[in-house]
Amino acid sequence: MEIRKPFEAGNRTPINHYPCMPTEEICALHIWGRPVKDIAAKDAVLFLWTTNAHLLEARKVIDAWGFIYKSNFVWRKDKIGLGYYVRTQHEILLIAVRGNIGPPKPANRPPSVIEAPRRKHSQKPDEVYELIERMYPGLPKLELFARNTRPEWASWGNHWAV
């Protein structure tokens, strides 16, 4: 399961691009009439996008949905942002698991840094989908807060639910 989390961001909220939600609402989120923690398979992997400013909130979501944090990717962008304390040039993709899911086979373990250009607002690099597909081939895939559809993935967001 991959998720782009629409955290509220104080005075820097992406509200002009899409509606945002408080962390508590994301933790209690229902899709297709059921809590996310019940939608995800008993044995599942969660890939959760976040930024430095929302890292602690992302960990709350992981816990609320019944997952255990394991590792992360860093998406290093080609353009630098404004930042608060430092000028941010990356996003973080947290990896969490629940149930009987182990790490990917050694041949399917990618490097932790993804180098890819920044695209439209909130659009993640296609390389990430390909990494997830290689890491866990054969597992069903669901993207929450999706901006696009992708073959072999179920998508849910404020644009569609397929």
Give the ranges of each region predicted by the language model.
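Class I S-adenosyl-L-methionine-dependent methyltransferase catalytic core
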Residues: 1-162
